[in-house]
A protein has these predicted regions:
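PLD/PLD-like phosphodiesterase catalytic module centered on the HKD motif
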Residues: 1-224
Length: 224
């Protein structure tokens, strides 16, 4: 959004500037804030449409969960991203009793989506591992993830991590999904490779090292 056109006030010296009545600028600030909020609303609606399109594209490729012992190798062309797997697979499962997610970095929209699924009971227990790059490059998004998981009693670790693994389990159904791929929890349209399988043995394999990583890599409250 363009910055409001504030005219040159033509101050001759600093005293004149310090003595200027700031009240007229308050209306400009209010107007600016209103425009920002309106723009954000448009952006949200656009992203919701895009997210729905991505979920539909993935559902066409994977119209059902892999059965126990089944494994699929998928190369995606950017029609959906790595995060799209989570809501689609949980939709098939009904809920995830456990969710483990390991990624190098993450965007804010997917962080918010994760918290919403936890709050709705679609994810019962969550454990997330990210890379230090995420903390350094996106501190505000990192803080949203860290604080959101902590408030909900979930687990989190940040360390030198570059793995991309997702685990989703529904014990009652006997589904233990493992997703391995090249992408992060972001929205970059790229050609990516994915492997998805339904195997409790492979699930427990990844769960073991992720639990260890979370124990040694637990992070502290981010500093301002």
């Amino acid at each position: 959004m363009a910055t409001p056109d504030i005219p040159d006030l033509g101050f001759d010296d600093l005293d004149d500037a310090l003595g200027f009545d700031l009240d007229p600028l308050e209306d400009l600030e209010t107007e600016s804030q209103h425009r920002i909020t309106t723009r954000k609303m448009r952006s949200d609606l656009k992203h919701e449409t895009i997210d729905a399109t991505k979920r539909q594209a993935l559902a066409e490729v994977m119209p059902a969960l892999p059965g126990p012992g089944e494994c699929y190798h998928i190369v995606s062309n950017g029609d959906f991203d790595y995060w799209t797997w989570i809501p689609v697979m949980i939709g098939y499962m009904g809920r995830a009793d456990e969710y483990y997610g390991s990624t190098w970095t993450m965007n804010r929209r997917n962080v918010v989506g994760m918290m919403e699924m936890i709050d709705r009971g679609l994810i019962v227990r969550a454990a997330v591992v990210t890379g230090l790059y995420f903390k350094r490059r996106e501190p505000a998004v990192y803080a949203t993830l860290f604080q959101g998981l902590r408030r909900r009693g979930m687990r989190f670790a940040c360390l030198e991590n570059h793995t991309k693994v997702t685990l989703l389990a529904n014990h009652e159904r006997g589904d233990y999904l493992v997703l391995e791929g090249s992408a992060n929890y972001t929205a970059n349209p790229r050609i990516e490779q994915n492997i998805i399988l339904n195997s409790e043995a492979v699930y427990r394999f990844h769960q073991g090292w992720l639990d260890e990583v979370i124990e040694i890599g637990r992070d502290e409250e981010p500093q301002d």
